[in-house]
Swiss-Prot record:
Pfam families from the UniProt entry: SRP40_C (PF05022)
Annotated stretches, region: Disordered: 65-637
Cross-link (Glycyl lysine isopeptide (Lys-Gly) (interchain with G-Cter in SUMO1)): 415, 572
Ranges that cross the membrane: none
Composition skew (Basic and acidic residues), residue ranges: 627-637
Positions carrying Phosphothreonine: 188, 607, 610
Organism: Homo sapiens
Family: Belongs to the NOLC1 family.
Modification type N6-acetyllysine: residues: 33, 415, 663
Start-end of Low complexity biased regions: 100-110, 144-159, 193-227, 236-261, 398-409, 441-476, 498-523
Disulfide bond residue pairs: none
Name of the featured protein: Nucleolar and coiled-body phosphoprotein 1
Residues bearing the modification Omega-N-methylarginine: 683
UniProt keyword Metal-binding present: no
Length: 699
C-alpha cells in the first residue's frame, strides 16, 4: 500500500510469498492450486516471509500518514486500480488472504484485535471467494490496517477505518470513509464524547468486527471483504452514532454489519457466530430502536417517505444479491439490517447530526465504493458538523452514489460479482440504509449547506467510489462510468443548488441500473427507482427550503410518480443500452438524440432522395459491359467484311491460293505457313497494287 505511491506494485510480486506461506502452514492443496493458477515458484529460503512483512507493517510508522483524507483517496484509488488491474491479482490476493487468515490466526498478538474467529472468517471467506480477490493487495492493505488496528484499540473508531483499508480495495474505501469519521469525532465535541463513551463498545465491536471483518475482507476483496469492511465501518460509525444515540445506534449498525458478514460468506461460521453474539448484545442494548417495526411498516411512518421505498429497494436488492449468494441468509440479514437501519434512521430524523453519522456508518457498511464515497462526505460532515446540513447533503449524495456504485460493480466487475454474491445484499442493504439515513437526514436537517460543498464532496466521492468499486477491468469501466455519472450529478447539483438531492437521483438511477444489470429484474430496478424517487419527493420539499429545488425536485418535484415512471423507463432503456453506462449520461444522450438524432435521421432519410432514381420500368437486363455496342454503330459497307474473298479482284488473284491454305491456319502455325509461302516455290502471278485498296472520301 505504502509502496504503491512510489512504485507500482504488481500482484505477481507476492506470488512466491503467498506460495511459501501456504506451504509453511500445511496448506498443500491450496498451495498446489495456487501454484498452478499463478505459475509461482517457491521463494528463496532467505527471502522474507509474509509474516515478516506483516510484522514490519505493524511496526511501520507510515500508517498514521494515511489518515489524511484529502489526498489519501487518490492514492488509494491508484492502489486499487493497480490491485484490480489483473484478475490474477485478485486470485493471488484471495490466496494470500487464505494464507494470511491462518497466518493472522497464528499471530493474533500482532493483530492486536485479531480474534481466532477473524482468522477463521478469513479462511472461510477466502475459500468461498474462490481465490478471486486480490490477495497481494489485500495482504498489503491488511498489513497497514493491522498497524492501524493496533492503534484502533486505543481508538476504536480509528482502528476500524484502518482495518478497512487493510482489507482490500473495499477496505481501502472503507478506511477512507473511516478516517473522515475519525475527523468527525475530533471536529464535534459531541461525537468525541460519543467516541469516548462508545469506545469501549466500539473498541470491542469495532476491533472484533473490524479485525474479524478486516480478516474476512482482506481474505477476499470480493463481497466478503466489502461486507466486512462495511461492518467494520458500521461498528466505527456506530460508536460515532452512539454519540447521540450511542448504544442503540451503535448496536443497530453492528447488527447490520453482522448480517452483512453472514451474507459476505455463508461459509463463515465463526465470523457469523461472533457477529451474531455481538448482535445479540447490541440488539439488547438498542431495545426500542432494534424493536423498530419491520422495514415495510416503519418507512411510511417515518417522515421521509423515502425510507420505506429504500427499504423496499433494499429488499429487492437482497433478492438480487440472494440470487448471486445464499438467498436466505441475504434476505434474513437484510431484514435484520433494515430494522437497525430504521432505528438509526429514526434517530437520525430526530437528530440530524447522528443521522449523518448513521448514514456514514451505513455507507461504510456498504462496499468500499460506498464507504469511500461516505468518507469524503463524512469528512465534510465532521469538518462542517457545525453546518450539519451540509454534511447531510454531502453524505446523502455520497451515500446514494456509493449505493449506486456497489450496484454497478455487481453488474460489471468480476470481483464486483463476487462481492455482490457474498456481500451484495449487505452492500445494497447498507447502501439503501445509508441512502435512507442520508435522505432522512437531508429531509430532517433540510441541509442549508451550499451546493458547492455537496458538489465537491460528491465529485470526489464518486470518483473514489468508482475507482474503489473496480477490482477488475469491468469494474474499472463501471467505475469510470460511475465517476462520470457522479461528476454529472455534481454538475447538475450546482445548477439546481440542492446538491444532496441531485446526487441522490443519479445514485438511484445508478442503483436501478446496476440492479437491472445484475439481471435481478428491470422491475426491481424500476421499483427501487420509484421508491427512491418517492423518498426523494418527500425529502425534497424539505430540502428545497435550504437548497432550493434540486434536479430531483425539478424533475420529480411535480409528481414523484411521474418522475418515477420516467426514470423507470429511462433506466430500462439504459439497462438495455449499456449496463455500465450511467443513467445521467444516458439521459443526456437521450436528450441529445431527441434534439439531434431526429434531424440526423431526417437528413439520412432525405439524402437518398437527392440521388436520381431509375424508373421501375427502366430496369436494364443484366448483360456484360460493352464499351461499344454493335447495334449502335453504323459500319461502312466497304469495310464491313474484311475477308480476302470479299476483296475486289480476289478471284484469280495471286494470293487466292495462299488464302485457301492460310485462312484455316491460326496461331503460331500461321506464321510458319506464311513464311513457307514466301520462301517456297509458290508463284501467285502478277501483283496488283490497286485490288484491295479502298479510298475513303474525306468528310
Amino acid at each position: 500500500m505504502a509502496d504503491a505511491g512510489i512504485r507500482r506494485v504488481v500482484p505477481s510480486d507476492l506470488y512466491p510469498l503467498v506460495l511459501g506461506f501456504l506451504r509453511d502452514n500445511q496448506l498443500s492443496e491450496v498451495a498446489n492450486k495456487f501454484a498452478k493458477a499463478t505459475g509461482a515458484t517457491q521463494q528463496d529460503a532467505n527471502a522474507s516471509s509474509l509474516l515478516d512483512i506483516y510484522s514490519f507493517w505493524l511496526k511501520s510508522a507510515k500508517v498514521p500518514e494515511r489518515k489524511l483524507q484529502a489526498n489519501g483517496p487518490v492514492a488509494k484509488k491508484a492502489k486499487k486500480k493497480a490491485s484490480s488491474s489483473d484478475s490474477e491479482d485478485s486470485s493471488e490476493e484471495e490466496e494470500e488472504v487464505q494464507g494470511p487468515p491462518a497466518k493472522k490466526a497464528a499471530v493474533p498478538a500482532k493483530r492486536v484485535g485479531l480474534p481466532p474467529g477473524k482468522a477463521a472468517a478469513k479462511a472461510s471467506e477466502s475459500s468461498s471467494s474462490e481465490e478471486s480477490s486480490d490477495d497481494d493487495d489485500e495482504e498489503d492493505q491488511k498489513k497497514q490496517p493491522v498497524q492501524k488496528g493496533v492503534k484502533p484499540q486505543a481508538k476504536a473508531a480509528k482502528a476500524p477505518p484502518k482495518k478497512a483499508k487493510s482489507s482490500d480495495s473495499d477496505s481501502d474505501s472503507s478506511s477512507e470513509d473511516e478516517p473522515p469519521k475519525n475527523q468527525k469525532p475530533k471536529i464535534t465535541p459531541v461525537t468525541v464524547k460519543a467516541q469516548t463513551k462508545a469506545p469501549p463498545k466500539p473498541a470491542r465491536a469495532a476491533p472484533k468486527i473490524a479485525n474479524g471483518k478486516a480478516a474476512s475482507s482482506s481474505s477476499s476483496s470480493s463481497s466478503s471483504s466489502s461486507s466486512d469492511d462495511s461492518e467494520e465501518e458500521k461498528a466505527a460509525a456506530t460508536p460515532k452514532k452512539t454519540v447521540p444515540k450511542k448504544q442503540v445506534v451503535a448496536k443497530a449498525p453492528v447488527k447490520a454489519a453482522t448480517t452483512p458478514t453472514r451474507k459476505s460468506s455463508s461459509s463463515e461460521d465463526s465470523s457469523s457466530d461472533e457477529e451474531e453474539e455481538q448482535k445479540k448484545p447490541m440488539k439488547n442494548k438498542p431495545g426500542p430502536y432494534s424493536s423498530v417495526p419491520p422495514p415495510s411498516a416503519p418507512p411510511p411512518k417515518k417522515s421521509l417517505g423515502t425510507q420505506p421505498p429504500k427499504k423496499a429497494v433494499e429488499k429487492q436488492q437482497p433478492v438480487e444479491s440472494s440470487e448471486d449468494s445464499s438467498d436466505e441468509s441475504d434476505s434474513s440479514s437484510e431484514e435484520e439490517k433494515k430494522p437497525p437501519t430504521k432505528a438509526v434512521v429514526s434517530k437520525a430524523t430526530t437528530k440530524p447530526p447522528p443521522a449523518k453519522k448513521a448514514a456514514e456508518s451505513s455507507s461504510d457498511s456498504s462496499d468500499s465504493d460506498s464507504s469511500e464515497d461516505d468518507e469524503a462526505p463524512s469528512k465534510p460532515a465532521g469538518t462542517t458538523k457545525n453546518s450539519s446540513n451540509k454534511p447531510a447533503v454531502t453524505t446523502k449524495s455520497p451515500a446514494v452514489k456509493p449505493a449506486a456504485a456497489p450496484k454497478q460493480p455487481v453488474g460489471g466487475g468480476q470481483k464486483l460479482l463476487t462481492r455482490k454474491a457474498d456481500s451484495s445484499s449487505s452492500e445494497e442493504e447498507s447502501s439503501s440504509s445509508e441512502e435512507e439515513k442520508t435522505k432522512k437526514m437531508v429531509a430532517t436537517t433540510k441541509p442549508k449547506a451550499t451546493a458547492k460543498a455537496a458538489l465537491s464532496l460528491p465529485a470526489k466521492q464518486a470518483p473514489q467510489g468508482s475507482r474503489d468499486s473496480s477490482s477488475d477491468s469491468d469494474s474499472s469501466s463501471s467505475e469510470e462510468e460511475e465517476e462520470k455519472t457522479s461528476k454529472s450529478a455534481v454538475k447538475k447539483k450546482p445548477q439546481k443548488v440542492a446538491g444532496g438531492a441531485a446526487p441522490s437521483k443519479p445514485a438511484s438511477a445508478k442503483k436501478g441500473k446496476a440492479e437491472s444489470s445484475n439481471s435481478s429484474s428491470s422491475d426491481d430496478s424500476s421499483e427501487e427507482e420509484e421508491e427512491k424517487l418517492k423518498g426523494k419527493g418527500s425529502p425534497r420539499p424539505q430540502a428545497p427550503k435550504a437548497n432550493g429545488t434540486s434536479a430531483l425536485t425539478a424533475q420529480n418535484g411535480k409528481a414523484a410518480k411521474n418522475s418515477e415512471e420516467e426514470e423507470e423507463e429511462k433506466k430500462k432503456a439504459a439497462v438495455v443500452v449499456s449496463k455500465s453506462g450511467s443513467l445521467k449520461k444516458r439521459k443526456q444522450n437521450e436528450a441529445a438524440k431527441e434534439a439531434e438524432t431526429p434531424q440526423a435521421k431526417k437528413i439520412k432519410l432525405q439524402t437518398p432522395n437527392t440521388f436520381p432514381k431509375r424508373k421501375k420500368g427502366e430496369k436494364r437486363a443484366s448483360s456484360p459491359f460493352r464499351r461499344v455496342r454493335e447495334e449502335e454503330i453504323e459500319v461502312d459497307s466497304r469495310v464491313a467484311d474484311n475477308s480476302f474473298d470479299a476483296k475486289r479482284g480476289a478471284a484469280g488473284d495471286w494470293g487466292e491460293r495462299a488464302n485457301q491454305v492460310l485462312k484455316f491456319t491460326k496461331g503460331k502455325s500461321f506464321r510458319h505457313e506464311k513464311t513457307k509461302k514466301k520462301r517456297g516455290s509458290y508463284r501467285g502471278g502478277s501483283i496488283s497494287v490497286q485490288v484491295n485498296s479502298i479510298k475513303f472520301d474525306s468528310e
